[in-house]
């Protein structure tokens, strides 16, 4: 059984178990106590953010759909995939120098999150570039193919590693005061990813009022 089929089976098993146990609601990650919701004019002002949405992965042999929860900051990332009933089936916690993946009841570690996820799941997902695309930004290895009337990217090619990633910004929305993508489609060879951002929240350090102790 390949890695994607194994993960699909894991998600289906968790969904079935959740239904049998009559679980409801969604599991949430523990809060980042050092960060608070903020409003920004431009998504580039947010050095940290959190999102909730849907992720779909498609290959010639299989398909996978899951809820995605992602908290991103300059020095760490916390990514979780869950079933529709909220049961966690995958967590990936990483810093610039370490990564920990928990999947199917097993733990895996590496010093690179993208390499770890590809080794265990078989997905070559551009984790280093996704935070830019999620906030509608263009990276140094990106070539914009088409922009909209407001100058926002509609389609770009990432040429860092062949074959290149083709990224389409299908729709945009206003979240936390800024314009961010609502739907993204990524394609590379026979791998296709679709990401829908249902909620995107900019995060920042809480303001200290005059007279308060730091």
From Swiss-Prot:
The keyword Iron does not apply. Keywords: Cell outer membrane, Chaperone, Lipoprotein, Membrane, Palmitate, Protein transport, Signal, Transport. Transmembrane segments: none annotated. It is found in: Cell outer membrane. The keyword Membrane applies. One of its GO terms (cellular component) is cell outer membrane. InterPro entries: LolA/LolB/LppX, OM_lipoprot_LolB. Pfam families: LolB. Monomer. Plays a critical role in the incorporation of lipoproteins in the outer membrane after they are released by the LolA protein. This is Outer-membrane lipoprotein LolB. It comes from Shewanella baltica (strain OS223).
